[in-house]
């Protein structure tokens, strides 16, 4: 949130907000239900510019041909006409797909929670071996240039102790500092 950004960043000046980037896609699906609006936004921002791009790069880097069966044009067109109530409700996601899957695979598999490709960053950042590397980066001149390092270290301490689950913020800042070091400090 804005308060947290002001607390962590030196010289923080709000520019474009994430809502500025997503607004055109919500406008595109104006009048649709909230789920359809989020799907439109995901299709145009997250899938194309993020997840599919990463999957493509990772598979090509390893000489693999990747297929995304649910993005087959016919499957996608069919799925886009499924009513929202058959997609999600307050307690379940992928309702139609799970129902179809239960006809051919065990229910416990069809009803399994989506896992994706989890990386245990949350746990790594509670392990002093890895947290120490992050802490070192949080106390560099580069970190000092952009961030209030006292706040960064407090955020890391809260995460390690289990008081707050800050892994996403810590990881994003750490990745920024690694990138900055690689492309601006070392060059």
Which residues does each predicted region cover?
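Adenosyl-5′-phosphate
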Residues: 1-187
